């Protein structure tokens, strides 16, 4: 009796795990495009609308396969252990990201899928093994998004106290050194550091293909950027420098300021003798016309905003609630994030602007990823191809 062959959608096709393939995510596209924040309920949009993102496993699986088939390069999850409350219990239901990545990697063909790992709450030897498991499931398509800090409230759940800012990177360096030794050292090893003292460590198998997963970091401080330059293949940096017209919903990136951010990161890496990729995220609301897009934006993020969840985020950032114009400006900036709102033509132009500023890739947050990604793939991606940004 012969067993049936696996479905094509779950077969791994024509991709190696060479270092070059890992760094390029197996793609020759000048501008890489991926999905950001789909592993939790509501994604990155604090909205009450009924069509908001469920974050369910079935929807994540469908989205991963849809993104893979469309040629998107990456899936990047948020590391979240508790949410922000509000009427929607915003971001309270979330999948742990390494196991999430492993399962999705086994069901996709080409896309790189990251796990977001908080170094203070993951034992590095255990983390090294679980990440290798995910990497084998995807034949070399796992990536590590490394985070050395987070909210005090989340760490308290694990009985862990947040270290002083710069000290987090000392701890993070030891953590990553141990992980890399687990990934590369053929022999047993000891480790005697400030935060970790380990004896006779051994970890097999090694990552798929004898190379190491792509490592991403989002440090913004001087010490954080130095850490990233030493250790990581790419930076993920948020963009705030832009003007936003409240009436038209049109965002105008401050290209000079954005380019300065990218150039600074690349210069820091070059001074250390390294090259790095630079990525960012945007919140996309794309419709056939600008009018439809701005109307949907107002419906989702103004008329139906989960303001209690937004307030919780602001307060955690040190901005207490106040019924003032200044506070409302903070609210609006927080909920819309860095928005790409408009027609397919306009959104494609915004992607091109970010590429010209030096970004290698962009992660998209979307109100409902499954409902809206097909239009982006059919109407925005072909425009980027004509611009020479994608094949």
Name each model-derived stretch.
Residues 2-391:
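Active-site-adjacent structural elements that line small-molecule/cofactor binding pockets in enzymes
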């Amino acid at each position: 009796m012969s067993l049936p062959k696996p479905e094509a959608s779950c077969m791994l096709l024509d991709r190696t795990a060479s270092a070059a393939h890992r760094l390029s995510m197996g793609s020759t596209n000048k501008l890489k495009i991926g999905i950001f924040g789909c592993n939790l309920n509501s994604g990155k949009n604090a909205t009450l609308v009924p069509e908001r993102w469920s974050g369910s496993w079935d929807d994540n699986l469908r989205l991963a396969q849809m993104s893979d088939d469309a040629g998107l390069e990456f899936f990047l999850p948020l590391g979240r252990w508790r949410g922000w409350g509000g009427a929607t219990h915003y971001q309270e239901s979330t999948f742990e990201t390494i196991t999430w990545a492993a399962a999705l990697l086994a069901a996709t063909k080409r896309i790189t899928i990251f796990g977001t790992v908080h170094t203070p709450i993951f034992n590095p030897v255990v983390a090294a093994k679980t990440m290798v498991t995910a990497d084998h499931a995807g034949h070399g398509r796992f990536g590590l998004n490394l985070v050395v800090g987070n909210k005090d409230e989340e760490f308290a759940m694990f009985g862990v106290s947040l270290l002083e800012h710069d000290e987090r990177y000392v701890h993070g360096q030891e953590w990553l050194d141990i992980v890399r030794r687990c990934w590369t050292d053929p022999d047993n090893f000891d480790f005697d550091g400030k935060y970790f003292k380990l004896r006779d460590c051994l970890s097999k198998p090694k990552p798929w293909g004898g190379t190491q997963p792509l490592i991403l970091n989002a440090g913004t401080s001087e010490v954080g950027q130095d850490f990233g330059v030493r250790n990581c293949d790419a930076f993920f940096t948020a963009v705030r420098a832009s003007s936003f017209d409240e009436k038209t919903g049109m965002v105008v990136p401050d290209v000079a300021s954005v380019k300065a951010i990218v150039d600074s990161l690349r210069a820091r890496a070059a001074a250390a003798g390294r090259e790095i990729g630079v990525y960012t995220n945007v919140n996309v609301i794309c419709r056939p016309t600008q009018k439809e897009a701005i109307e949907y934006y107002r419906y989702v993020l103004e008329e139906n905003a989960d303001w209690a969840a937004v307030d919780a985020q602001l307060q955690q950032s040190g901005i207490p609630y106040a019924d003032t114009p200044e506070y409302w400006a903070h609210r609006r900036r927080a909920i819309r994030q860095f928005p790409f709102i408009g027609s397919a033509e306009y959104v494609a132009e915004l992607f091109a602007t970010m590429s010209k500023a030096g970004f290698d890739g962009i992660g998209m947050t979307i109100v409902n990823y499954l409902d809206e990604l097909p239009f982006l793939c059919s109407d925005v991606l072909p425009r980027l191809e004509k611009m020479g940004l994608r094949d």
